[in-house]
Amino acid sequence: METKVLMNITKFVANSIGHWRSQRSAHHLAFGHFEAVQSEIDIIALPHDDPAVIDLCKSYNIDPQTVVSPFRMTWEGQSDWDDSEIKGTCVLVPIPDPDSPHRGKLLRSRLCRNNRCRGDYYFTEHGTFVLVTAYERAAAEEKIWFVNPNVRCLCVSLIKTSVRFSELLLPHFLQKFARIFRIKLYMTIFKSYRYKLRACSLYINAIALALPCHFFINTGA
């Protein structure tokens, strides 16, 4: 008997559209500092014939007709520790697998220092969205699911590097306040570079639980 998958990319994106006000807290072990970041995040649906969607598809030689539920994410915020500008925007384009609609690829523009990147996604039988993105030296696995229509929770990225070095992965807690409450977890990746420890924040919209952790959801007014 075939297992029924509770979520698909169209429903997932529809549930994610909206304006978010976020508060993210992080503990940077390398510097012994707690950081608080406040930001505003907007996710809006895009038409299939949007020029940004067409250009992103062309860059991967993908037929724009195969696109489902493209959207744009824009964020702007400030940190109580780092004076660097926290601001950006990117276009995300899901491409479902025609033979397996609960799997596919996710094209993303202007993500992390790269002009674009592509990840592979799938939905578990419980409705969890899982995205795996390969980078030059690492691969990030991200997960996200909805506890109910009003709560989206837990985003953690697990980074696996090709370099034999013990990395410290620290999840961040991010609670989204809007008309509905959403929670994400982000993480800071610490790695060795010329025998020094550098901190690198991975800011991704979308995303998941890869490490055991506890979390709490405040659904009050």
UniProtKB/Swiss-Prot annotation:
<comment type="similarity">
    <text>Belongs to the CpcS/CpeS biliprotein lyase family.</text>
</comment>
<dbReference type="GO" id="GO:0016829">
    <property type="term" value="F:lyase activity"/>
</dbReference>
<comment type="function">
    <text>Covalently attaches a chromophore, probably phycoerythrobilin, to Cys residue(s) of phycobiliproteins.</text>
</comment>
<dbReference type="Pfam" id="PF09367">
    <property type="entry name" value="CpeS"/>
</dbReference>
<keyword id="KW-0456">Lyase</keyword>
<dbReference type="InterPro" id="IPR012674">
    <property type="entry name" value="Calycin"/>
</dbReference>
<dbReference type="InterPro" id="IPR018536">
    <property type="entry name" value="CpcS/CpeS"/>
</dbReference>
<protein>
    <recommendedName>
        <fullName>Putative phycoerythrobilin lyase CpeS</fullName>
        <ecNumber>4.-.-.-</ecNumber>
    </recommendedName>
</protein>
